[in-house]
From Swiss-Prot:
Record protein name field: Centrosomal protein 20
BP-aspect Gene Ontology terms: cilium assembly; microtubule anchoring
Ranges of residues in domain LisH: 49-81
Keyword presence, Cytoplasm: yes
Gene that this sequence comes from: CEP20
Length: 175
């Protein structure tokens, strides 16, 4: 007859081989986070750029089946429960997708574009080089369409947004 220690070892090994142990641990971490999250303390509103960045990350996490990581990101960042529409993201980020690129997260296409840009010497979609020191703090009270370029420096702890003059053309990638 097997000992309790042997049964534990076999159970752990089986769960690891199936990938279930990793899922169980992630689920426990997400549940602990949700239990400890203080809902009474209001979160500061997300700036437009952080909302878009978080949405790109959420799309990536959900595509890769990191659902507990995505739920923690949504809760911790104060992201809306309902994901933003992909077409909205494409329009806001001034991205042009080819038909094959729609099957993977936008983040894959963005990364692929910049990894291969040097090889193809495209003048399209070059991010402007901006010195953050020369701009005042961002005016978050205005919608992003009303902010001018000098309002682009973020508050401490927030990411700076960049604007793309030409559309970012994403082509299909092999994953």
């Amino acid at each position: 007859m097997a000992t309790i220690a042997e049964l534990k070892a076999v159970l752990k090994d089986t769960l690891e081989k199936r990938g279930a142990l990793r899922q169980i641990k992630a689920r426990i971490r997400a549940e602990v986070f949700n239990a400890l999250d203080d809902q009474s303390e209001p979160r500061p509103p997300l700036c437009h750029e952080n909302l878009l960045i978080n949405e790109l990350i959420r799309e990536y996490l959900e595509f890769n089946k990191y659902k507990y990581s995505a739920s923690v990101l949504t809760a911790e960042a104060g992201q809306p429960e309902v994901p933003l529409d992909r077409q909205f993201l494409v329009k806001e980020l001034n991205i042009v997708e080819d038909a094959n690129g729609k099957s993977v997260p936008l983040l894959y296409g963005i990364i692929s574009h910049f990894l291969h840009r040097g090889k193809e010497e495209s003048t399209q979609s070059t991010l402007p080089k901006v010195s953050l020191l020369s701009y005042p703090r961002q005016n978050l009270a205005k919608p992003s369409t009303e902010r001018n370029q000098k309002d682009r420096i973020p508050e401490p702890g927030r990411m700076a947004g960049t604007s793309i003059e030409e559309p970012l053309v994403l082509q299909s990638i092999k994953r």
